[in-house]
């Protein structure tokens, strides 16, 4: 299991994810579930929960598409974040449903939180489902969580509002993550933690925390 958080404030975006994967108590590993793309006129932050193989396949395809010079669709060619969400959603659906595999009996789906900003466009935050469709958070509760959400969500419900500052959102995200770490053994450190400031077009702070 995993736990990932994305919070959109009036000042910026906060994203956090744990790094634990497990297939039973005797098979625990550490894998980063965060991808950051920070260059030129755009910053894209991605965290994921679900099938690790699918998530890594999506990340690898994103990187390969960025290196492709043939004009293929990639994060650089997306004109706004709706296009970013559609692009990642299409990759997610493709890798979640490989040809010839019975997806009724094999769980291959991954869920993504994608946030950031393209120059001249507003900041955005999306949740992308295994089927490729996506949603935005409610204006009244501008955050998204995926994975093992039940322990860390109550503090977010109490603190995160449209007027929350990026500092308070950062502290709230860390408390939410710590609550989950203490309550669920399938979620564990290190914690990848990123802060993006509005109209900065680069990551303000990126840390790997052993909390």
What are these regions (language model features)?
Residues 1-211:
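N-terminal nucleophile
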